């Protein structure tokens, strides 16, 4: 009896329900069972069902860069650990690929996709390419950057945002014109019928800081400096759908400020080590309660000496906050094994140390770590006209 005959005896809805509970790498294998299964898995109904299931089991996504090679891992975020102070989990390798040019640092994350604005891959050989990747499926596509008019127009950042209403991804590039002393923007809607960059202007002249971005409920947030002397700091709030800007003045700014999703609201976390980069570690948290009224809530937490873990007591960095409010920290430059992730619960004042197995396999030098909290696997990647399959531990035919 072949696979189609087996399938006939099982209700299709039941098959889809079972498949939707599997990880993405297992879904890739299931496509090879039969043409019928492949057809079912590609249906929009199934991709939506899979996304719904995946949303209930968020993961910590980890990207490791070493000399131009990128590897993507995921591991489950701990739940119900009930008094435990340490756990050991295994990292799941999703894919890896190589850059063609010098290694570049920095990326932008939005709704399960990662944008590497300065990355080139040997297949295309174009110096002006960026790469957008779906780490769950192994697919990636190219974003050809807009040509600049002259050397006096300088791009400051290249950001990825997502509009959850129209389900559109957009790339935003702020460009500062030194002659006109103004900030223009190039913006690209991915997957649009008319492909092309558009220009929009900002009501204020500003230069983005290098603290990164975060997109929450269709608003892309990043930090910048304004004024002619560029000596005032603001929070830029860009509505991805309407393409309107709001600027909020900040009374405090630090180069280590991390933008986070704090229970559905924009949060900023500053970290301050008391002694030589070690514990105790002070975390100052600002949560944006109301954009129109510019109302903020503030909290201060301290990870004390009795919280520390000897292997990772120095140079930790905040990478995000889980949906339940736990602050996640890692060492972003790694030379030692094994790899640790720390989850600080501010309500209970507890610190959970998670040792991650399998992350350092094949790594032999200093490498950089990027981590993204509450990553949800998504099978969709229809935002690019042409896509490619990155090298992974699975064969090419197993990729979407």
From Swiss-Prot:
Cross-referenced InterPro entries: F-box-assoc_dom_typ3, F-box-assoc_interact_dom, F-box-like_dom_sf, F-box_dom
SUPFAM superfamilies referenced in this protein's UniProt entry, alphabetically: F-box domain
Residue span(s) of domain F-box: 4-49
PANTHER family with a match to the protein in the record: BNAA05G37150D PROTEIN-RELATED, F-BOX ASSOCIATED UBIQUITINATION EFFECTOR FAMILY PROTEIN
Protein name (database record): Putative F-box protein At1g30920
Lineage: Eukaryota, Viridiplantae, Streptophyta, Embryophyta, Tracheophyta
């Amino acid at each position: 009896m072949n696979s189609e005959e087996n399938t006939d005896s099982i209700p299709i809805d039941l098959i889809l329900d079972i498949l939707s509970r599997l990880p993405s790498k297992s879904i890739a294998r299931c496509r090879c069972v039969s043409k019928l299964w492949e057809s079912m898995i590609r249906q929009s109904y199934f991709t939506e069902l899979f996304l719904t299931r995946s949303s209930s089991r968020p993961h910590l996504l980890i990207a490791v860069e070493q000399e131009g090679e990128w590897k993507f891992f995921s591991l489950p975020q701990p739940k119900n650990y009930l008094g435990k102070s340490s756990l050991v989990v295994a990292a799941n390798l999703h894919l890896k690929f190589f850059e063609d040019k010098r290694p570049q640092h920095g990326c932008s994350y939005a709704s399960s996709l990662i944008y590497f604005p300065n990355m080139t891959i040997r297949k295309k050989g174009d110096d002006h390419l960026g790469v957008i990747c779906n780490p769950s499926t192994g697919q990636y596509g190219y974003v050809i950057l807009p040509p600049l008019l002259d050397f006096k127009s300088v791009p400051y950042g290249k950001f990825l945002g997502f509009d959850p209403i129209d389900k559109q991804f957009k790339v935003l590039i702020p460009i500062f014109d030194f002659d006109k002393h103004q900030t223009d923007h190039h913006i690209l809607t991915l997957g649009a019928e008319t492909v092309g960059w558009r220009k929009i202007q900002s009501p204020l002249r500003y230069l983005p800081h290098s603290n990164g971005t975060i997109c929450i409920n269709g608003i892309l947030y990043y930090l910048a400096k304004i004024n002619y002397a560029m000596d005032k700091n603001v929070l830029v709030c860009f509505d991805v759908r309407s393409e309107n800007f709001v600027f909020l003045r900040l009374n405090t700014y630090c180069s280590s400020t991390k933008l986070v999703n704090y229970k559905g609201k924009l949060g900023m976390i500053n970290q301050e080590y008391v002694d030589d980069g070690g514990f105790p570690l002070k975390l100052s948290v600002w949560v944006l309660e109301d954009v129109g009224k510019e109302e903020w809530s503030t909290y201060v937490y301290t990870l004390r000496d009795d919280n520390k873990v000897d292997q990772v007591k120095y140079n930790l960095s905040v990478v995000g906050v889980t949906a339940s409010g736990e602050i996640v920290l890692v060492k972003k430059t790694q030379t030692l094994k094994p790899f640790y992730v720390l989850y600080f619960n501010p309500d209970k004042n507890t610190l959970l140390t998670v040792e991650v197995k399998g992350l350092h396999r094949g790594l032999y030098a200093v490498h950089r770590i990027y981590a993204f909290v509450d990553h949800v696997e998504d099978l969709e990647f229809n935002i690019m006209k042409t896509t490619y399959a990155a090298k992974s531990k699975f064969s090419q035919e197993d990729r979407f």
